[in-house]
From Swiss-Prot:
Domain of life the protein comes from: Eukaryota
Keywords in alphabetical order: Antimicrobial, Secreted, Selenocysteine
Signal peptide region: none
Function: May have antimicrobial properties, like most ant linear peptides.
Localization per record: Secreted
Name of the molecule in the record: U1-poneritoxin-Dq2b
Amino acid sequence: AHFLPPLUL
């Protein structure tokens, strides 16, 4: 999943 601040999990 992508979140802000940019994190790719």
